[in-house]
UniProtKB/Swiss-Prot annotation:
Organism the protein comes from: Corynebacterium aurimucosum (strain ATCC 700975 / DSM 44827 / CIP 107346 / CN-1)
One annotated Gene Ontology cellular component of this protein: ribonucleoprotein complex
Family named by the database record: Belongs to the bacterial ribosomal protein bL34 family.
Gene3D superfamilies: 1.10.287.3980
Name of protein: Large ribosomal subunit protein bL34
Gene symbol of the encoding locus: rpmH
Length: 47
């Protein structure tokens, strides 16, 4: 039986658009994520 293809196909533009700072800030839930990461002291807030 053949295995499926690898599901992670890296693409920086897609990564930024899905998980980037501006995308996060555009929704209330996204802002909550950034706030939680700031509170925790994460070096990286978003992708």
């Amino acid at each position: 039986m053949a295995k499926g293809k690898r599901t992670f196909q890296p693409n920086n533009r897609r990564r930024a658009r899905k998980h980037g700072f501006r995308t996060r800030m555009s929704t209330r839930a996204g802002r909550a994520i950034v706030a939680a990461r700031r509170k925790k002291g994460r070096a990286k807030l978003t992708a």
